[in-house]
A protein has these predicted regions:
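Conserved beta-strand in the GNAT
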Residues: 63-65, 114, 124, 190-192, ...
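Vicinal oxygen chelate
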Residues: 23-25, 56-57, 61, 78-119, ...
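Core segments of cupin and vicinal oxygen chelate
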Residues: 8-11, 18-62, 145-188
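N-terminal beta-strand motif that seeds the catalytic metal site of vicinal oxygen chelate
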Residues: 1-28, 40, 76-78, 124-156, ...
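Short loop/turn motifs that cap or connect beta-strands within the blades
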Residues: 43, 67, 104-105, 194, ...
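A short acidic/small-residue loop/turn micro-motif
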Residues: 70, 107-108, 128-132, 174, ...
Length: 276
């Protein structure tokens, strides 16, 4: 890892979607069968529910957890770029997905289909057709997408809180943002105005930054509500959490230590015992 990326764990990028939903074990089976995901970590609570898990899909990481206490379910929308959208759509359906729409050629140059997984997350499965690459420039395999009422204000929040750069924005004649993309660090985040069946949908994202405390303060100053103030975590990062005005969760972190899976589990057990 280069010097500039020390605040990001190996294999991760600035932004990682964090799916909080029921049936994470079932979800991991789905993404493995449908998208060729590779499990990289899984840790269960005493009651058997999954406290944290992660998978790799080609060049992207995704994290998952089952709801617990104040952390409620937040099924998400994810844009997935792969070389053959039709084949991946068929695999997703065979793995237990429900069709949102069959693959079709879109006006923006993608061939795309939509599938809802058994845990309630929506996957927009696409192959880009305009550049000779299966993903548009700057995109990776996995891109999180926020659907909100008030996308223009959301873009302003992302700029103030996280230093986001707007790289694409399409508005309708009334000035409503239909779709936009911003760059945060090395990662793209998509945003759109909720409408029709595509209603508001809060989601969670893990955001790695050089100074978690400073970015947390910037998020609060930009209008977010604190969920947890930054502190050193047993799993090797300093992190805090904030919720924006649209209900999206931001887990703002700076990587501090690279730990083995065994060490994470040992520290987790100690943390659980200390918490009582």
């Amino acid at each position: 890892m280069n010097e500039q990326a020390k605040h990001v764990p190996q294999g991760f990028h600035t932004l990682t979607p964090y799916l909080i939903c029921g049936g994470v074990g079932r979800l991991m089976k789905f993404v493995t069968e449908a998208f060729g995901a590779v499990e990289t970590f899984r840790m269960a609570r005493e009651d058997g529910t999954i406290a944290h898990a992660s998978v790799r899909i080609v060049d992207s990481m995704m994290e998952m957890a089952e709801p617990s206490g104040e952390w409620k379910a937040m099924p998400a929308g994810v844009h997935l770029y792969l070389p053959d959208a039709d084949e991946v759509y068929r695999r997703a359906m065979a793995a237990g997905g429900t069709s949102l729409y069959e693959p079709q050629d879109m006006e923006y140059g993608d061939r795309e289909g939509g599938v809802k997984d058994p845990s309630g997350n929506d996957w927009y499965i696409a192959t880009h057709r305009l550049t000779g690459q299966f993903a548009p420039k700057g995109f990776r395999t996995v891109t999180p997408g926020l659907s909100v009422k008030g996308a223009t204000a959301l873009l302003q929040f992302l700029q103030k809180a996280f230093g986001a750069d707007v790289v694409f924005k399409k508005e309708d004649p009334e000035g409503v943002v239909r779709v936009a993309a911003v760059m945060i660090g090395d990662s793209v985040l998509e945003c759109s105005e909720a409408h029709g069946q595509w209603g508001p949908r809060p989601m969670a994202n893990h955001l790695y930054v050089p100074d978690a405390d400073a970015v947390y303060r910037a998020a609060i100053a930009a209008g977010a509500t604190s969920l947890e103030e930054p502190k050193d975590q047993f799993y090797g990062e300093r992190s805090g959490a904030a919720m924006d005005a649209w209900g999206n969760h931001w887990y703002i972190a700076t990587h501090q230590e690279t730990l083995s899976e065994a060490e994470v589990r040992r520290r987790a057990a100690e943390h659980s015992t200390a918490a009582g």
